[in-house]
Design a protein with these regions (language model features):
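RNA-contacting regions in translation and RNA-metabolism proteins
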Residues: 1-49, 62, 66-84
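Glycine-centered tight-turn and secondary-structure capping sites
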Residues: 53-57
Length: 84
């Protein structure tokens, strides 16, 4: 895993972990795609999904914005998805 991919995964984890009640269930899988972008999959306990999404999706939008901003210096696209 590239250093930037690891940094983005760590950033996403550091933002989500304090939001949830079941941090042991947090799984983050970050990988670089063929086109050079970074894809981050986030899995949390069912009970915590609403906290990560936030009202009207504001929390997950903010997490995506932070991840994209962190990668903007290298013009790398980042996509963060919350999976069931």
């Amino acid at each position: 895993m590239a250093a930037q991919t690891e940094e983005i995964a760590g950033l996403v984890e550091s933002v989500i972990r304090p939001l949830i009640d079941n941090p042991d269930d947090l799984v983050i899988d970050a990988r670089e795609t063929e086109d050079g972008s970074i894809f981050v999959e986030v899995r949390v306990n069912e009970e915590d999904a609403g906290k990560v999404i936030g009202r009207q999706g504001r929390a997950i939008k903010a997490i995506r914005t932070l991840a994209r901003a962190a990668a903007s210096s290298t013009n790398t696209h980042v996509d963060v998805e919350l999976l069931d």
